[in-house]
Amino acid sequence: MGNCCGTAGSLIQDKQKKGFKLPNPFSNEYGNHHDGLKLIVLKEPTGHEIKQKYKLGRELGRGEFGVTYLCTEIETGEIFACKSILKKKLKTSIDIEDVKREVEIMRQMPEHPNIVTLKETYEDDKAVHLVMELCEGGELFDRIVARGHYTERAAASVIKTIIEVVQMCHKHGVMHRDLKPENFLFANKKETASLKAIDFGLSVFFKPGERFNEIVGSPYYMAPEVLRRSYGQEIDIWSAGVILYILLCGVPPFWAETEHGVAKAILKSVIDFKRDPWPKVSDNAKDLIKKMLHPDPRRRLTAQQVLDHPWIQNGKNASNVSLGETVRARLKQFSVMNKLKKRALRVIAEHLSVEETSCIKERFQVMDTSNRGKITITELGIGLQKLGIVVPQDDIQILMDAGDVDKDGYLDVNEFVAISVHIRKLGNDEHLKKAFTFFDKNKSGYIEIEELRDALADDVDTTSEEVVEAIILDVDTNKDGKISYDEFATMMKTGTDWRKASRQYSRDLFKCLSLKLMQDGSLQSNGDTK
């Protein structure tokens, strides 16, 4: 991101084309200060000592790369949010480029009432600190559920705001790539509070007609052309269309028990308008959804066309009749379960540590029988067998194809690390067990109500027993009032794969999935992309 004269991701892609190996600055070999060098992430931070100007307060949230704190400007007493990204969590050069690009995009975006404002940036030896506008009004779905009475009119207002954000992004050459309800917060708790886009971590700069092939985003909201690995800014309209569908009925339009199933449903693009409440939803609303979720991006509506659509234009006159308790209940369940999964994913991500990569590198040395610093597909297969990991030959080829970034027919140590977590997951669910242990504080073998309430203290309003009980009710299939490991594992693996514990591993996972879908004929690759 720092220097954005080229296209998004061009630095990484150009070097990969030339066979240039980007180092992992926090691998065991490199370390935080290798040969006296420090990792510098930002090109021009505001400063280096954030605590000279701001006082960091309570924790507001925690993500894959760091922690968000309440932040007070010492001189004025003004309150902000500070997103502190820990350098030790940036395990690959791609992670570092993501942070650079996120900051550059937020700096270049003009002020907009529905986009969170970046105030200042700081960088010290341990972290990058982003001081941003504070949004205290909660997540989109939580607000909807709390209101109780939910209508088409309310959905039209929300989607209009989201599309205006998309339009602003596209106008300034930014593709968001990760539009989902969790990435929108209300500015405050007032009824009239603005809805704001808060996360640009996967966004990229683009030029008209430019195509991308990196698989990013969240499964439910992913456009078919992302899986085909040839896409442009049209994917943001698709994601917004998925959000609109969920707003009107409470469940995603493309759903299955596994990520592979979700991907196939997306590629088929069959939209269900038969189940409740669709019979009472207006034809205009359904027409807009169909046009936003058109499988051909060339025929999908643009942001301006969405805003010009009759359902949006007449949004203030849209039906104000409640869509029913069923929709509200579904939205609540969808929101609550996302929170539990998200909390578990954070635990898993914390275990994908430098210590784990050290173990993986030891395995690489065992496989590298020729001692040339890279392994062939044969060595990979034999090595996996020796480690007791049974992987079908077809899957080994898929892993090899996905991991071999420079396409030289070998895996070097960094490429091996990038795919190894998926290899390990094929053999066991050790990270999922670690997540379960995190919740099961008293080692009873079950997650009990008190343990669940404590674990989700930062994520839900624990004054409401209703929320915690809703999770227990949904996950506890044998109705004994607590969650067993098997029930937890089933919940985590339903609908979206729990293994997306980190952004990079998610990219690798979907790359493998895309290759597999190509092999079984579910999709065809569309032309050359960047």
From Swiss-Prot:
Any Pfam family hit: Pkinase
InterPro entries tied to this protein: CDPK_Ser/Thr_kinases, EF-hand-dom_pair, EF_Hand_1_Ca_BS, EF_hand_dom, Kinase-like_dom_sf, Prot_kinase_dom, Protein_kinase_ATP_BS, Ser/Thr_kinase_AS
Domain Protein kinase: 54-312
Lipidation (N-myristoyl glycine): G2
Annotated binding of Ca(2+) 2, by residue: D404, D406, D408, Y410, E415
Active-site residue list: D178 (proton acceptor)
Residues that bind Ca(2+) 3: D440, N442, S444, Y446, E451
Membrane disposition: Lipid-anchor
UniProt keyword list: ATP-binding, Calcium, Kinase, Lipoprotein, Membrane, Metal-binding, Myristate, Nucleotide-binding, Phosphoprotein, Repeat, Serine/threonine-protein kinase, Transferase
An example molecular function term from Gene Ontology annotations: ATP binding
Domain (EF-hand): residue spans on this chain: 355-390, 391-426, 427-462, 463-498
Function comment: May play a role in signal transduction pathways that involve calcium as a second messenger.
Record's protein name: Calcium-dependent protein kinase 14
Origin species: Arabidopsis thaliana (Mouse-ear cress)
High-level lineage: Eukaryota, Viridiplantae, Streptophyta, Embryophyta, Tracheophyta
